A protein has these predicted regions:
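Alpha-helical interface subdomain recognition
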Residues: 1-84, 103-108, 115-120, 144-149, ...
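Short glycine/proline-enriched turns and hinge-like loops at secondary-structure junctions
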Residues: 68-70, 134-137, 160-164
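N-terminal glycine-rich flavin-associated loop
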Residues: 85-107
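A generic local secondary-structure boundary/capping motif
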Residues: 112-114, 130-131, 139-141, 155-159, ...
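A short, Trp-centered hydrophobic/proline-enriched beta-strand micro-motif
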Residues: 119-130
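Cytochrome P450 C-terminal beta-domain/meander region
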Residues: 134-152
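Flexible, small-/acidic-enriched active-site or ligand-binding loops
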Residues: 137-139, 157-158, 184-221
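A short core secondary-structure module
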Residues: 152-191
Length: 374
């Protein structure tokens, strides 16, 4: 991100860039894929991230975090986008940390937030039930049962769901309102099925069959569950847009390097005007995306009530541009861009998957129109 960073944010970016380049380059994602890693990430790398304080960037200091805000989370995720780092950071340290911070009781915060901050436990958010993202379509039921609840339903494509130690599940309650519930994935009646996504990540489909929950599993009964869920998802969208920005920047950078080096017809292909025009177009698209992502993250930190419009715009733009950048990268690499030996294809695959998660560009465009009164 090219806006003026504070000294602390600059140090975070430099640290993230150095660590991820060394410990989680694109070649590491390839190894995870080839090994068929069931969790989809390296626990050793995740532990190191916790030791550096990254996992607690949106968690208050009183619960073991560093409370640097969503801009800091976006800085980390932008660098993750550059190396395609597969980690539970978005799922656990952003989505679930936000749910607990703003929806949890004091007891829930004290019990769970320190575990997220250290990386001791991994949390995953289970919302979607269909192939496409739609947070309003929730049929999973949490039926009142004495002092507790009975949970039944299914969730699809739960990011990091297969390796999670705890789930936060969105379910519809008896009065048709939405509640967020803390659920132990090892409880009786839960079945997790590993899925392989196109980007070599490992989401899970999860079935809940009359799962018994204690009354304190519900995040803060006084909260409006729908409003809390909107905040949680928006935090994830803004930070995911930062990852998509990093992906788009890296795909563009690699492509620019390639066309400057590749010889064809006795000259560098970067000298061809047609490719120069395409590269210039990509540069302007990436720069516009950066502006939107920066605005969305800053608004989320400084004026959260005004953030939803900017977040929807940023997610829509980042989805479109990350797909454009990675697609153009393959085209300008030519035939080798289609081969598995070249890493550029991994960027294209991640762009497809990240674009669908938490809402694609069509969703974002519709959301912008809705929030603008159309």
């Amino acid at each position: 991100m090219s806006y003026i960073l504070s000294e602390e944010e600059q140090m975070l970016r430099d640290s993230a860039q150095a660590f991820l380049t060394e410990k989680s380059p694109v070649s590491e994602l390839r190894r995870l894929r080839d090994e068929g890693c069931k969790d989809g990430f390296r626990h050793a790398i995740w532990k190191e991230m916790g030791e550096m304080g990254w996992n607690g960037v949106v968690i208050p200091e009183e619960y073991g975090g560093v409370d640097m805000g969503y801009t800091a989370a976006g800085i980390i995720l932008q660098e993750m986008g550059r190396t395609l780092a597969a980690t539970p950071f978005l799922a656990s340290s952003v989505l679930c940390a936000t749910a607990l911070r703003y929806g949890g009781t004091d007891g829930q915060k004290s019990e769970h937030l320190p575990k997220i901050a250290t990386g001791e436990k991994i949390y995953a958010l289970a919302v979607d039930e269909k192939a496409r993202h739609n947070a309003k379509h929730i049929e999973t039921r949490a039926t009142k049962d004495g002092n507790g609840f009975r949970l039944s339903g299914q969730k699809r494509f739960v990011v990091c769901g297969n390796g999670a130690d705890m789930l936060i599940v969105a379910a519809r309650m008896d009065d048709e309102s939405i509640g967020l519930f803390l659920v132990d994935p090892e409880a009786d009646g839960i079945e997790r099925t590993l899925r392989r996504s196109v980007d070599s990540h490992a989401p899970a489909n999860i079935n809940f069959d009359d799962v018994k929950l204690d009354g304190d599993a519900l995040l803060s009964e006084t909260e409006d569950g729908s409003a809390l869920l909107d905040l949680v998802l928006d935090s994830g969208r803004a930070c995911l847009a930062a990852e998509q920005l990093g992906l788009a920047e890296e795909a563009f950078s690699r492509t620019l390097d390639y066309i400057k080096e590749r010889d064809q017809f006795g000259q560098k292909i970067g000298s061809f005007q047609g490719l120069q025009h395409r590269a210039a177009h990509l540069l302007t698209e990436v720069e516009m995306t950066q502006s939107l992502v920066v605005k969305a993250l800053r608004q989320l930190d400084e004026a959260p009530s005004q953030a939803p419009l900017w977040i929807a715009a940023a997610k829509a733009k980042a989805t479109k541009v990350s797909r454009l950048s990675s697609s153009e990268a393959i085209q300008m690499h030519g035939g080798v861009g289609m081969t598995d030996e070249y890493e550029i294809g991994f960027f294209y695959k991640r762009a497809q998957a990240a674009g669908e998660y938490l809402g694609d560009d069509a969703w974002g465009t519709s959301r912008v129109a809705e929030l603008s009164g159309f």
